[in-house]
Every structure is written in structure tokens, then in C-alpha cells.
């Protein structure tokens, strides 16, 4: 249960009970009331701004109104004390019995604790990675892959119906270049000396194997075909090979998509999907024939000094109108974006999330304009931009072997440090902030390595369970037994740990609403820190040890607390796509 939602309802009920009315009549607007943890934990457990946001409407001084509300809240049987602070904040401190009762709820819910129905009935498409199928994934793709995957997992946990999607850019000019590059490797595999790879083609050694496979399958037959026919075959085989490589790279990172959508699908049957999308926009009055003035700076590839078919995107929030069809009748890449969004909308998605690299910042307004025009404002589109990742080794820029050409691959990074450190650390900054990834730091066993610190907390929880088996003979811990004596958890440090656990449902919902999966990584680190601190207190003070052989009921209660910590760590790490280890290896 979200305790902050619980007390939001209680506070609003209290406002009704004291018959609070606006001075001008009508109903009070309670939508701006906030209920959250105080910024300073010493001030209490729950804080609300109710008096400050309502004072003007009711015509009363904020502190006086706060005192009136506070007095009424003291009647709540779960409230220990109520204080008014600053200009009119109301801080509530809750009784230990409340936290003991909430801990039992958490224990009974297990790893489902924190699961929400926030997104019930909402269908969301999260598109991420969508790397061009021209080679292995490089480290620049890594952050977007993790952010998109974890965001999708988070939204699912918050009750949304989520589809993870990868858009295969397999219809552009770069694919023609790729096919010609592989054709060269095919000739090489047949024994021809090809010399230096010509400028403009892909030089990567990863294409050698594709050429060899073509030579094994076709022999010299491709050389005997008309070039266009041979290149079409090479293109299909190469896209399949590149996507197999990309899927393997993603699998190594524990990233899995539900849908792989081919751009070529938009171009079948004389690009019927694109034509239909443009026709729909035309019927809505969003398309016209015109000539765009030359933009400042470097000219984009779709600008022409002649009449084109244009999208009236400035009427729906964009900076400039966008070309859909060139003067020669060919479609722009942007026209495909329109058709692809329409395809998503026609599949019933209420919301589309695009996770893109920071170099795609110029796409944001045009995509938002497409969403407004295609859906008549009914669908929500969000673009998350991921800033660059800089690689370091002991504080110095990383120097790594580049086995795939001119870049460090995603697989290089995962193979060296492991999947879990990569996933966790890619979340340890907000996606729109640059991120430094230090190979030494993410493998050291210290508090300064967040993923180690969190996973070590999980392992420590299980070590407590093993101690219970050794010292108390409790091999199979029973949740009913563990939850039957929570009234014995009275130490302030234990209650503080319960408070931290109780924040989890609110954290899940806020991270989902704001689409900020990094919040989960931060929370797990804080929870791990709280648990490690409690462990250390037991080391310093025998009375606070989790296992008290001479007090089995207290031991069971503390084991229940440890079980909930383990459940929340497991839940959060699962959403992140990392393991919750039972022991460190």
C-alpha cells in the first residue's frame, strides 16, 4: 500500500470533517495538496502543504489554518504527534504500531509489494535502441538500451500494458551502402583481392563472415546475376545477419524486445502505409503544396529549392513545416516517421515513448507535432534523450581494443565488467545528464560502487537467513510466523528501516509518472545503505542483532523485517534487469 496515498485520503477527509469552506462559496480545490516525506526525516514521517495551498481560498492565515488542521489530525489513531513548521507545513509523526502493521502488509505481499494499478487500462509503446542494422552495437547504444528497457519494466510493474519495440532502419541509403560493402566481402571470400575498402563503404571486419556465408551458400552465382538482383539478395541476408548480431548483443545485456518493426514494411505495395498516413493528414488540413525558405546554416537533406508536399507542423507546435514528399515524388524519411507513428496509434497505444540519443534532440518537436496531428491530440508522445557515456579506467579515458572497426562495442563493455554493473550504472544518472563509466569503479567491492553495494545487501539478507537455520534451526522461514510478533520491533533504527521500505510504492509510481527510472537505482542504494547500517548496529550492539538465540519471537520479527528488505531489493533489481544474489562470488 502507498502510505502517502493513504494519508492523502485521511487528510482530505479531515478537511471535510472540520467543514472547511472557501470564503466565496462553492467547493475547495484539493488537487494541489501534496502529501510526501518531510525533507528532513527528523521532522516526522508525513508532511503536507494543505494549509498553505488552501489558506487564500478560505481566507485564513496559513499557520493559523495549519494549527486548526493539525489539531483535527491528532484524533487519528495512527498519529503520534502533529507539528506546524515554517510558513504552514504540517508534519505528522506516526505511532510504532502503524509501522508494525504496515510491515505485515509488506511481508504478506512479498515481491509484489509496490506493484501498482496506476497504469491500468493504458497501453504504452516504448521504442528504444533502434540502431541501424549496419554493424555491432557500440557503447553509445548501451545507455538508451538500458533506460528504455528498465522504463518499460517499471511501467509494467506500475500496471501499464507495455510493448517493447525496436524499429529496424532497413530501408534507407545506408542499407544500400551496407549491401555493396558485403558484396565486396563476398568477392573477397571467393578469392578475389579487393585491396583497400573504398571510402564510403563499411570497413568493419564483422562483414567478412557475412561475405563468407554468402560464398558458401551461392558460390559464384551472385556474380552471374544482374547487379540489382544480386544486391537485393545480399541486402536481405546482411540485414538478417546484422540483426542476429544486434539481438545477441542485446541478449548479453539482458535487453529483450517484444516487437521488431521493419521500416521496409512501410514501403511495401508502393509505400501504401506512407501514402495512407499522408492522405489522413491531408483530410485533416495538415498538408499543403509549397516551397520552404532555405534554413539557416547547413541545409538538411530533404530541403529543395522548389515546390514540395509539406506538413503544416508549425500549426501543431513545431518550429518549421516539414517536407513529406520531394518534387520527384519520393518520400522523405520524415514521411516514414509519420506513417510509423500512425501504425502505432492504429495498434491502440495511448502513449508512445521514444528513447533516443542526445544527437536526436532536433526530432523532438517534429515527433510531438506528428502525434498531435495524427491522433487529434488524443495520444501522448514523450521523447527521452540519453546523453553520452564517457568510458574511464581508474579516472583516465579508457583505451580498449576495438575488435569491430572504429568503435568500442557494447559487447566489449559487458564482457569485461558483466551485465549487472552495466545496467545499474547506466541508470545512476538521469538520462539527460552526461555519464562517466569507470571500469575500475564498477568492479570494486566498496560503498562507492553502487551495484556492488546494493547486491551485497541482498546477499547479506540471505546470510541472515542462513544464520537463522544454523542458530535457530529455521530452515524454511514461514512468513506467518515471522509476521506474528512485529510488535517487538520498537527500536527507532528498526522503525526507520520500515519507513524506508514504505517509500517503495510511492517511488514506483512517481518514477513511472515522470518516466525517470534512475529514481529506482537511487532508492535501492539508499535502502541498501539503511540495511547495511542496521547490520553494523547489530555488530556494535548485541541487543540489535537480527538473531537473538534467547528470544526466538524477536528473532522471527527481525527476520520478517530482513525478508521484506530482501523482497524489495529483489523486486527493484528485477525491474532494473539485474540479479539479486543470495551470496557474493
UniProtKB/Swiss-Prot annotation:
It comes from the Bacteria. Its main location: cytoplasm. Keywords: Aminoacyl-tRNA synthetase, ATP-binding, Cytoplasm, Ligase, Nucleotide-binding, Protein biosynthesis. A motif ('HIGH' region) lies at residues 131-141. It is an enzyme of class 6 (ligase). It catalyses: tRNA(Arg) + L-arginine + ATP = L-arginyl-tRNA(Arg) + AMP + diphosphate. One of its GO terms (biological process) is arginyl-tRNA aminoacylation. Its EC number is 6.1.1.19. It is found in: Cytoplasm. GO terms for cellular component: cytoplasm. One of its GO terms (molecular function) is arginine-tRNA ligase activity. The keyword Kinase does not apply. Belongs to the class-I aminoacyl-tRNA synthetase family. Monomer. PANTHER family: ARGININE--TRNA LIGASE, CYTOPLASMIC, ARGINYL-TRNA SYNTHETASE. This is Arginine--tRNA ligase. The lineage of its organism: Bacteria, Pseudomonadati, Pseudomonadota, Alphaproteobacteria, Hyphomicrobiales.
